[in-house]
Amino acid sequence: MIRTLTTFLTSSFLAFPATAHVVLQNMEGHAGYQEYVTIAVPHGCGASPTTQVRVKIPEGIMIVAPEQKAGWVTAIIRRKLAEPTIGEGGAKVTEVIDEVSWSNGNLPIDQLGLFTLLVRTPDTPGRVLFFKTIQKCVAGETKWVDTIPQGEPTWKMWARPAPAPFMVLKKPDAPQLGATMQQILEERSKLGSPSATR
């Protein structure tokens, strides 16, 4: 079962009433799926409101689409791959989105801010994706970048001083679209181009 933000925050505040973390709204996702990744910011830097949220995209994520957030400026930083790879539909990919930021905003310390990405997760069930996040405020910043080695129990993340928001990839029961991309491409080739069917 996917553990939601509400469940986490409830248990977190019961266990640690004086603390809260920047987390993902859903901490589990399917390997090889398009997933919404929502970073939840439940507080500021002490008594200072949040003005920027920067997220480092984990290795292996080839597709990223950040949501435009009203009142904030969304920006992306791209990174060239050491070697080109093949992406969706057989297209050659030479660079990927490395970082996404939302800035020039003002999130009060007592309000919850949600910052969303649509990503294509790697096809690696069991892997933990760490979305290292830097929360900048009017005064100061917090770097939510602490991680654990792959294979370690994820509960150990909560013992870290500033755990990075993370998602555990699980094996899906079926392809997200009901068929593999190869099957879809083969079916598409049978139908031909739109102009050929007129």
Model feature map: region roles:
Residues G32-V37, R127-F130:
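Short, solvent-exposed loop/turn segments enriched in Ser/Thr/Gly
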Residues K80-I109:
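Extracellular adhesion/glycan-binding regions together with long Ser/Thr-
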